Amino acid sequence: LGDVYKRQSEICSVPEAEKNKTEDYDFTGKRALLAEDNAVNAEVFQGFLKAVNAEVECADNGEAALSRYQNMPDYYYDMIFMDLNMPIMDGYEAAKSIRGSKKPDASDIPILAVTANAMAKDIVKVHEAGMNERITKPVQRELLYQTMEKYIL
């Protein structure tokens, strides 16, 4: 019986290489804006970002994200993560509004769609709204970090 539990423990345990993946990334001094209306998703995402020393500020809808972006100093955020389906203002409209703003970083700041939608038409809409790329839900931590590294390091 002891062997069964030991084997089950080996199968279910997280490999050491997986445990230390965050050590490969350090986003100290980088600040992200996360627009996400689902509190659980926001909490998980914040945990991923904080694990690699990134600062994160949250907005629970597109309008709040747009307001935060517009009311902060120029170049305050290094990246924006945008859920697409939110109340009040969706992520598509928020991204278009950010891109259309008069702030000097409006055309350059990386805006990444965070969505479960993986259809080709959804990807086209993401790019039409001015977003750089799409990260699918559920978010895979390693892919998130690689994408962040691509845009802000």
Please place each PLM-identified region on the residue numbering.
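C-terminal compact regulatory domains
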Residues: 3-153
